[in-house]
């Protein structure tokens, strides 16, 4: 058996040399005969477009329309399917059902992909027939009666009818479903699909065939959102983990293709190469999987890509460095343009075939002079072996091969040893000088061959140019914040402090009027200082970008800004998570990954925060009568930001630096939302609170397909909100038109800092968010460790009588065996030690009467459920498989939340006007 660690080339060298000797002897025994017939040169098309048109015969042009009609996607060819269409809440969001017709397949795929369900690619359909029409076993109709056979009658096939459940007439190949869905989606849904597929460890579509329009599309834009983290060997104490966009990261590329017929499964071989010995991982869909042998109607010509990424542990890693693996679906002769691209970007190409004849020789001899290494994996027919050897002997000098480049795999071949040998070849290639390419490099090569690149549309390029103009001026993050984002400096912190004091004395029984007047005067002076500034050049360019009349260009610009700002930010070296867990004291609970290792990044939210401060300052002066309403310059800012919220961008509700809400800005946003939604303004507010590193944001993203920032050190420090649309057909049943989801920053898990300023701010943050919410999800690192800020908020809200529905979630981040909700752990949470409870109660000056959650008056174990969620990964990332139990548990939690909303357990749903009043009051 091969070691689960890195491949050892020396271990396999003897096998390769023995094979070389056997192959050399076989060729030497053959008498070389010159090939008969015409000249063997292969003439490539005069131009790339001509070659591309020939990739699809004319009679295949209707196949796409037939497939789209079968899947119910024909209406999305002019008006593409959007991300908002795919994410809206409907009655199907609460059902865990198998697709019954082909028209169910696209939506089933999108729902399961959003939930990171490893079964998303399964296109098996189950027909749901009425009970009276279902075939049943005859004996079941007779209960316990004895069956007597009439000897005069023959036993007919009817006795098997109970097992002959009807199956769909038209099974759909999973790759056809993927291609049809991508061709029916806009650029942003395509990007979301590819990003989720990457998280599920599925192979990603790189070149999308389009048999209707005869143009293949290189999916560069769709790949832009794919970001992965991997380790290095040997691991270093600091900086041993690297996070990068897979579009920009360079790695050796290896392509696997089929020539004519191959008895060996190319995709299965790829999976074997990428999978550790103890666990099979099906990155590439192959013939041995369900419906894998079903004929492909529109997916031939698809090129997929997947990466091997090391964990930094030699005992686990198959290869010591990242590597890209490409897979061409279909025969290279029918998809020559894709094959030619693969020869220009790959370090080595493995060609699987059963036979090499004159036709194949013509094709391959045209690659003379190629710098790529070629390897053949043969499974020859008995009567064709001599022919194969003859043509191989001619190809060896043409493709600069030697006999070690020919591998034979037949049914009797040891599969484990063969995979070990292929890995050894790949390792050998990477140890010698070889090309390393990024997806951007691949796209450049594709352009030269005439392939369409999805990123080359005018809207996308204009947005990219504007982003580059902004980010080009960012040399130092601290200096840029100080000089360009001036309203977020010390003045804003003073404003937040004054507003906090005003809020505190507002609730005092006998507020001192003189002190209140002083605070208001001080606040007005600070706001006047802010209003004296004009937006900097960078902020003005940002405003121009989101003010574009083209909705597509606006969305492209926001995406480009996210990536551009991420590239210019220079994070501090990242230690491995294991190192942090090793160094931290055991009593510290969950790790706060935000400091001291990661500085605050620069993101789109900082530009929007600057806009919010200009709006706040101007509104304050108008309210005080210091500025005529007709002279307002920034009154349109909330409308611009609202457009982004409606298109799925998280907007900041509470500033992460001061943990203070920009009241006028948030109110302005909600007023704009009320106007925009008109009659469909009934809201349910769902929030999530918890300590850092508990998977809270990932949980929300998985449950609803949201875009909250995830990852240690990058999560929100304040609170962000996103809006989910409820389908009109379901809104009456659910009782709301939209769900507003709030994701908060991490809260302190320990008790030692309770008396500090940070705890007070976090308690206020938790109180505000929970006070706005109908449903609150509390994410815990341990069942016995509830953040004191949350307990503090419980006590405050209990006075107001506002008690949302609470769901406690404990994510088992390191153990995939945690299943279900355990009564024993629920009891532990209810009866957890009273240190935190007593300390919190003492701050509220309510004595020692309340010591656990179970002592709180609002607590109802039947309504406040405790969930134990298994870990997301089954194994060690980055090559770990997604844990199916995680997806299933998240779906059950989502269904419970929606059921509680529908059944009214989440308290009275709000309209936007009521939410505005709550924000002001809290």
UniProtKB/Swiss-Prot annotation:
One of its GO terms (molecular function) is GTP binding. Residues 1-20 are annotated as: Disordered. Pfam families: URGCP. It is found in: Cytoplasm; Nucleus. Keywords: Cell cycle, Cytoplasm, GTP-binding, Nucleotide-binding, Nucleus, Phosphoprotein. May be involved in cell cycle progression through the regulation of cyclin D1 expression. This is Up-regulator of cell proliferation. It comes from Bos taurus. The gene is URGCP.
